[in-house]
């Protein structure tokens, strides 16, 4: 037993020494540039938090006046999308960098509305669905705090703000979002120094800082039967989990 423990200890020591062994650095001066550009591609999962109002009084325009309806709205899954863009990065010092990354986020959110007041033949709430397409033009401003480089990798964390313009939205949708939004970004990543470029995989979490619901949308609806679904929500906040690859 003692021989096995000694062998395992020696093996662990050898592996640790090998992991900490200095190697030839690829692109050793790449982080000394005052400013540089790059491109980015990635994928993301997006969700929409919806605050339901509960019972509501609506006029369906059928001559029966105001009637009470209860409709719940939910995005019951995380929907995938993709991201493309460019970046410019300013070196502040050996630890901090400031990055500006104009990009476009494309995706679709699957929303489900359940009318609890009007039941179907099976006694279940009737449902309506909406595929809320999203196309955002963004320009993220991130502060990067990086650890010292070791061999050909360098971990880091980020914190930033990402203002976005929403280019999507239809007049006949149940839910419509505002044309602008602002996201808080928190994430982590690691620089990998390859022979010809630096690869930076990054995972970040994004949360909307404002209510992104277009509350004036209900005034433009032509079909009054849609009102109960549109008015079932009084607040929405978007959130994303993004995996991005930067090539610099």
Residue ranges and their predicted role:
Residues 153-154, 168-171, 175, 198-200:
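Short conserved catalytic/interaction loops centered on acidic-Pro-aromatic/His motifs
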Residues 176-184, 189-193, 198-199, 206:
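Active-site/pore-lining binding-face segments in mid-to-C-terminal subdomains
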Residues 20-81, 240, 246-248:
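Short glycine/proline- and aromatic-enriched beta-strand/turn motifs that initiate or cap beta-hairpins
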Residues 1-24, 245-248:
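Bacterial Sec-dependent N-terminal signal peptides
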Residues 22, 26-35, 43-47, 87-169, ...:
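Gram-negative (and chloroplast) outer-membrane scaffold detector with strong preference
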Residues 33-37, 78-82, 133-139, 153, ...:
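Residues that define the transmembrane beta-barrel architecture of outer-membrane proteins
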Residues 51-75, 108-134, 167-177, 213-233:
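Flexible, solvent-exposed loop segments that connect beta-strands
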Residues 195-248:
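Predominantly the C-terminal beta-signal and adjacent terminal strand-loop region
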